[in-house]
Amino acid sequence: TWKKVYQSNRPYETTWKVSFPSEKVGYVSIQSYNPDPNVKQQRVAKTTDGGETWKEINLVEDAGARQFGIGFIDEQHGFVGTMNSGYETKDGGLNWSPINLGMACNKIRIYKDANGKVFGYAIGVDVMKY
């Protein structure tokens, strides 16, 4: 049975992509289609209890940074693709830094090989490799 565990309380927002780097910790990208150019704050939702509850965390104040893809290497280190490129966190979403993920990064896939080496792909207008 499916049950609703999160929904933004702001108009023009929808959840888009999800990444669970562990059993308990997960992140969801939140797209904002708000036509008001003064609404700039973009957010991500995070769970630390396996998806039972979600807390919003700030990503960036940029109305043009519409979010698409999201992918995490581990509970702390992850990426969010946006319309104009992307952002990286190394502290579980407390801080975000701009990073080149190409334009309109819609999907981010992170993989680990048998030896634990991490590699990934960010896909949008371009295909970017990590």
Predicted features and spans:
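Short glycine/acidic-enriched loop and turn motifs that connect beta-strands
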Residues: 33-37, 127-128
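Blade-level signature of beta-propeller repeat domains, shared across WD40, Kelch, NHL, RCC1
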Residues: 109-130
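Repetitive beta-architecture junctions, highlighting loop-to-beta-strand starts
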Residues: 40-42, 84, 118
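Asp-box/BNR beta-propeller loop motif
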Residues: 1-10, 42-58, 86-103, 126-130
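Recurrent small/Gly-Pro-centered beta-turn motifs in extracellular repeat architectures
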Residues: 29-32, 82, 124
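Entry beta-strands of beta-propeller and related beta-repeat scaffolds
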Residues: 24-28, 76-79, 116-121
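Repeated scaffold domains used in trafficking and secretory/extracellular systems
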Residues: 13-19, 65-69, 104-111
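Loop/turn-rich, solvent-exposed surfaces of beta-rich toroidal or solenoidal domains
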Residues: 61-85
